[in-house]
Amino acid sequence: MKSKIFAILLLFAFVFTSCNGYGTKLKYQKTEVYYTSKVDKKEAEKLGDFLVSSGFADDNEKSVQLSKNEDSGNYEFRMVTTKEAAESETYVTIFKIFSQQISDSVFNKSPVDFHVCDNTFKTLKVIPFEARNDSLQ
């Protein structure tokens, strides 16, 4: 009887700690990559591999989330950062470049909107994807 109760409590604890509302978690070095049910695991793994190869995933703790906007069909790269980063034109420029790199390298040039988020993945600012004109390069 005690072992059944222990098993039930253990299962409850696992389910409770897994249900954070951020999605399923993958780990790449010290970067947490969450993905929602709107994308599949292979897409999230491809993103995680890119984050490692690009040097984004490193020894510093970071949290990102991958989702997809049901209305526009755009991918959403959601990153936990500061309110100051959301308001900085320098960071906005960097985030635009990074979303373009993710689009090109991970999602076959599909649009990727960058969401600057607080530590609960609440969006502070959306940086919409801007398609690059390849004929100008």
Language model features with spans:
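Short edge beta-strands and adjacent turn/loop segments
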Residues: 25-27, 54-81
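Solvent-exposed coil/turn segments that connect beta secondary-structure elements
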Residues: 80-84, 117-119
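C-terminal motif of bacterial Sec signal peptides marking the signal peptidase cleavage site
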Residues: 15-18
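Short, non-transmembrane amphipathic alpha-helical segments
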Residues: 47-49, 56-58, 86-109
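Bacterial signal peptide processing site
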Residues: 20-22
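Post-signal peptide N-terminal segment of mature Sec-exported envelope proteins
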Residues: 28-46
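A short amphipathic beta-strand at an alpha->beta junction
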Residues: 102-128
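Positively charged n-region of N-terminal signal peptides that target proteins for export
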Residues: 1-5, 10
